[in-house]
């Protein structure tokens, strides 16, 4: 290697981002959307930043058996989410670490105290540059929720949200400094676009029109409206099948057991839809989710609540190139705009049935929507999202 080559190699090495980062969030194998998000994000960042792999400080709910969870090696510290002293001890651990930056995933429900208030002394005790990712930005917060968001935002060097609407809301409702906010989309796996039939055959659904929705089951999913809609759908499309995929959310299971799932089963029986609606009651691996999505013709998220600023399941579905139907919650409004999906009125089973029938009756239109969604979602695949996060960390740390 001559001198010029040596110089070039040295310059190239100097451009590498070598950032030590700690991530505070729930984490796998805990069954939680943010846990899955954090695992996927850190996996993707590790590929781009292999010299300093991600360290995890996980939020543990002992009431859900968290003290018995066998976490992977990258989990370096566990916070008992309902114990304030545990947060302060974790802040000390972070401050004494060699981390350059701390990334916190925020959702009110994963932190202890009223409205997750324990996050305030935790964040205010951290002496490292801090990046917050907000998974919820409420339009009409309580006084306490607003105070929490404002105080932790004041401490952050940067704030990540996943849609522009959430950024606007942080500024208008919470008074957050716009210069701190950056929009980075929800990450998704890189799924091949293609025909559904080969995947239906693998799963035993050949010859059927599949409508699906997946995720941890809870009342906020609105599946009762999807089941009611299927009464009209099967009149026109007797081979249509609705798949409701995923086990009940652990917190729901602890608080009320399987009441919601049982209510869905009663609806299925009441409407005589046993051959057209299927509840798949298990926690799905990523490969299973991808397999079901690749077999799906129409993906539905009939959520009754309209304040949701992100939906990992809808993000996955557009990333798989699915024709999606959703109620107009904030995330859906943004990602399904410009002929990338259809919106329905919340709680209106008749409207949902009409939209499903329309897409089943018009396969060319369904394909057009699916292609538009897939093209839009290419910037959301994990390598692209990870690069945005890593570049943000570089700006924050000056590296």
Where are these regions (language model features)?
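Conserved donor-binding/catalytic core segment of Leloir-type glycosyltransferases
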Residues: 23, 204-221, 227-230, 242-245
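A conserved mid-protein helix/loop that constitutes part of the nucleotide-sugar donor-binding site
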Residues: 36, 117, 218-232, 350
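Carbohydrate-associated surface elements
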Residues: 165, 187, 248
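A short helix/loop element that forms part of the nucleotide-sugar donor recognition site in Leloir-type
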Residues: 193-205, 210, 264
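Nucleotide-activated donor-binding/catalytic signature segment of Leloir-type glycosyltransferases, i.e.
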Residues: 256-283, 287
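Conserved acidic donor-binding segment of nucleotide-sugar-dependent glycosyltransferases
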Residues: 338, 342-349, 358-364
């Amino acid at each position: 290697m001559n001198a010029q080559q040596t110089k070039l190699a040295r310059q190239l090495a100097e451009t590498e981002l070598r950032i030590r980062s700690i991530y505070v969030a729930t984490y796998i194998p805990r069954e939680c959307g943010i846990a899955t998000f954090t695992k996927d994000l850190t996996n993707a960042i590790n590929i781009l930043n292999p010299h300093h792999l991600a360290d995890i400080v996980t939020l543990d709910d002992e009431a859900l058996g968290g003290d018995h969870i066998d976490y992977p090696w990258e989990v370096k510290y566990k916070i008992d989410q309902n114990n304030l002293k545990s947060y302060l001890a974790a802040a000390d651990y972070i401050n004494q670490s060699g981390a350059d930056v701390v990334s916190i995933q925020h959702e009110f429900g994963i932190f202890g105290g009223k409205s997750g208030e324990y996050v305030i002394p935790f964040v205010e005790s951290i002496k490292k540059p801090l990046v917050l990712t907000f998974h919820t930005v409420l339009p009409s917060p309580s006084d306490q929720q607003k105070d929490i968001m404002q105080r932790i935002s004041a401490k952050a060097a940067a704030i990540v949200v996943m849609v522009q609407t959430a950024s606007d809301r942080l500024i208008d409702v919470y008074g957050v400094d716009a210069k701190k906010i950056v929009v980075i989309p929800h990450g998704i796996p890189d799924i091949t676009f293609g025909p559904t039939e080969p995947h239906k055959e693998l799963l035993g659904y050949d010859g059927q029109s599949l409508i699906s929705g997946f995720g941890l089951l809870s009342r906020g999913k609105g599946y009762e409206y999807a089941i009611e809609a299927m009464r009209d759908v099967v009149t026109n499309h007797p081979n249509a099948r609705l798949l409701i995929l995923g086990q009940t959310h652990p917190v729901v299971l602890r608080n009320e057991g399987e009441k919601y799932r049982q209510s869905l089963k009663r609806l299925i029986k009441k409407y005589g839809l046993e051959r057209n609606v299927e509840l798949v009651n298990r926690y799905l691996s990523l490969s299973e989710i991808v397999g079901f999505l690749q077999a799906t013709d129409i993906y539905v998220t009939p959520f009754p609540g309209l304040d949701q600023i992100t939906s990992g399941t809808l993000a996955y579905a557009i990333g798989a190139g699915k024709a999606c139907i959703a109620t107009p919650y904030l995330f859906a409004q943004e990602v399904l705009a410009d002929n990338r999906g259809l919106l329905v009125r919340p709680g209106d089973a008749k409207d949902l049935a009409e939209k499903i029938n329309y897409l089943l009756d018009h396969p060319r239109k369904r394909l057009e929507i699916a292609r538009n969604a897939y093209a839009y979602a290419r910037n959301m695949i994990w390598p692209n999202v990870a690069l945005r996060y890593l570049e943000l960390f570089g700006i924050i740390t000056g590296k």
